[in-house]
Amino acid sequence: MFCMDLYKLFLEKKALLEGHFKLSSGLHSNKYFQCALLTAEPEIAEMLCETLAQKLRADKIEANLVIGPAIGGIILAYEMARALKVKAFFAEREEGQMRLRRGFTVKPDDKVIVVEDVVTTGGSTREVMDLVQSMGGEVVAVASLVDRSGGKVDFGVPFYPLLKVNVETYLPENCPLCAEGVPVVKPGSRK
């Protein structure tokens, strides 16, 4: 799938929202990619993750585990793992930190792909990477549906976004939408 096709899909599914949003990173933006509206349709989730898996296979990225941060990375981790025929875990926030729960554990010889729905600053992805490394695993790649940083994020491992866009973000104190008094909406999962 090409970038423009995915962008069109966001538009067709009304999954590219416009307004005033507070992102999981704490930054504000006038656009929000609601990936849940895409992954709610199993055939779309499967197709997107198979496309990501093809990119990883083409570059000979080998892993035995895919981990996604909750909530946006859960379905993606499962579908990526299914496409790659490996296990899928998800990390969830507990007391402000990403943790593996539910009996999930990373072993020292695990090679892990971290998958996320949208990357803005890469904060949640880095938290999962740190978690994997703290348990002795090796992160071999990062994948996402959307890189909205304009290519500015560097994870130190190969990064595979399906869609790269440069969408304006603002610190809350410099946000023109706040200055105009436009109410802010927080559609993401981080509190």
Swiss-Prot record:
Orotate binds at residues 120, 148. It catalyses: orotidine 5'-phosphate + diphosphate = orotate + 5-phospho-alpha-D-ribose 1-diphosphate. Homodimer. The keyword Ligase does not apply. Pathway: Pyrimidine metabolism; UMP biosynthesis via de novo pathway; UMP from orotate: step 1/2. Pfam families: Pribosyltran (PF00156). It comes from Carboxydothermus hydrogenoformans (strain ATCC BAA-161 / DSM 6008 / Z-2901). GO terms for biological process: 'de novo' UMP biosynthetic process; pyrimidine nucleobase biosynthetic process. Catalyzes the transfer of a ribosyl phosphate group from 5-phosphoribose 1-diphosphate to orotate, leading to the formation of orotidine monophosphate (OMP). SUPFAM superfamilies: PRTase-like. 5-phospho-alpha-D-ribose 1-diphosphate binds at residues 116-124. Its cofactor is Mg(2+). InterPro entries: OPRT (IPR023031), Orotate_PRibTrfase_bac (IPR006273), PRibTrfase_dom (IPR000836), PRTase-like (IPR029057). Keywords: Glycosyltransferase, Magnesium, Pyrimidine biosynthesis, Transferase. NCBIfam families: pyrE_Therm. It is an enzyme of class 2 (transferase). This is Orotate phosphoribosyltransferase. Belongs to the purine/pyrimidine phosphoribosyltransferase family. PyrE subfamily. GO terms for molecular function: magnesium ion binding; orotate phosphoribosyltransferase activity. Its EC number is 2.4.2.10.
